[in-house]
Amino acid sequence: MRKNVAKKVMCAALAAATTATAFAGCGGSQSSNTIRFFLGGTNSQMEMYYKLTDTFNETYGKENGIKVNAVEMLAGTDITALLGSSNAPDVMMVSDDTYKKYVIGGYFSDISDIKETYTDIELGDIAATAINRLYYDTKTNTSNTADPLYALPMDSCPTALYYNVGLMEKAGIIVISVDEEDLDRWNNNEIADKRGKKKSDYAKLNGVTVPKKGYFRSKSPYYFSELSDGWSMPSEDEVLVFNNRIAMNWDEVEDLAMYFSEAYNPGTNGKSKWGTTYGYFTETWFNYGWTVGGDCLYDLTGKGDWNFGLLDPNPNYIVKEGKTFTGRTGTVYQAGETIAFYDKMQADENEVLVPDNYGDYERANGGKAGIWTKITEEMEKGDDSALSELPSTRTAFKRYLKLCISKDAFVEDSKGLNISPSPAKILDINPIYKQFYTGDILCFVGESILMQEIAQYADEYGCKWDVAPLVRYKEYVDPADPYCDETVAEGTLSGHSRNTNMGVNSRSKKQEAAKKFVKWACGLEGQKVKANCGFFPSQPSLKDELKFTGSYTPANVNVFAEALEYQRPGDWWYMPNTLWVEAWCRDLNDNVRNGKKTFDQWYVNAIKATNTSLEKYKEYER
């Protein structure tokens, strides 16, 4: 680490109690054109930020008389304790989970004019999903583009499925890279895939028509159903294909993960036959709940009557291709859109449904609310219906929760799968991405920022890796038929992205210089530097600028660019603080996911505690 570039700020405990005079020796005299930039992160992130700062100082900064001094913050430092000091930063970065807190506290300057000013700096095509979350009205909690803007996305980190190509090939899985719309031509050997391979390059695929699936096994695919025979080991002559351009469904990712989990395919020394312990990991439930149109936060009326919705047992609905549907409140839904909670439930105008302790809802005058009668009538039309039914949010959440639960334990009505490590097995010294590049897990859901962390160790561990789309809900007409890829219903493409947001200290006396650095760093030139260091840029058009350490590098990085088009912030961003999230997730992550408490022991108290907490948020929209 370059000690001459940055002077480290005191640790969190000391910083919180420190007065401005205690930092008198840290900063020294600063010229009117020198600004201080506080930063933090992993070693590779820090080197990227230093490179970014150096490049600015050598180019735009030099041309415009601005110098940036980078100051490294230690992990856990309370930056708010420093903002009024003489050594406070002019430019600082915060993640999505604390962004609203900083805006409400008055720590960030309003930079709404930054797009129109400093026209010699190009912002480029920053993804709307990344920047729109940074508009913020502190009174209503809205993020509309007419609301004030307080930061720009320095790091827009979409998520994808990281997978070990080498392990798949070792296990006899053919890895292809063919878009769904191109698969027929690829099967006819008319075109090569995105890795330059034709079907004829794989002798085992002779006479096999690969279906439009993320993971295909030619004889005995696993699917979760009371009628299913359960998981079976692939036979010696079974064809296995993984397509990194098509999202797997819930069954497929579990099928694949079981093959690489010690609990299903035991080898030696507590590992699977392939040397892995587990097959799959996702820390969050987002792409499970969101793909079916659910969420953990429901608005019961569309007017700010908030409720904990993660355990809603009522089915969800999505509009079919070429159709529209008008919801109960008059909202017109287009093809591919899921029906909002307040538009799917039976209720009168302005009626506020009453949540029960199971996760369901009652009418204000008593009795179960149930699905709106117009939706019920629409579904009775069968194939002519404008809607397809999707699983309930509760069902989706339980499917996620089962991943790390013991095979002997129940998640309400079905047993756990034990194909993922529990949170207790993911430590600071052994994070999930380390378990990945050391070959202990086949695949995991991770943010784009982890690409460089993996790339720098991939050569050492012989980890040939790439990325693929996140899991998506898909129900096949006949899940028992390996070649059936016709669907009854498909959920939306879903997943979260996490920003690191760069803004200007509202107390800085160097507002103009600081804003220029923010725009440059988050604009095309700064993001190009970032991409050259192996970090995904906020502008999808810069994806070809990505450069990685080592010889093992991902070829399918376009997945992240595609993800930026639809991924959104996690639940930590929804409200001005995360107290309502902590009301249910701490017990879940500490106890339920670690096998110390059952699902049934958790959910009643989680519902009560969260809904009580949400009563304090009634004045907010979202």
Roles of regions detected by a PLM:
Residues E254-S261, L300-I429:
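Glycine-centered hinge/linker elements that transmit conformational signals in sensory
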Residues D96-P158, D182-S218, F224, I318-G322, ...:
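Hinge/lid segment of periplasmic solute-binding proteins
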Residues M1-R36, E615-R622:
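Short, low-complexity disordered leader/linker segments with a strong preference
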Residues T55-R133, G166, K170-A171, I176, ...:
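Extracytoplasmic "Venus flytrap"/periplasmic binding protein-like
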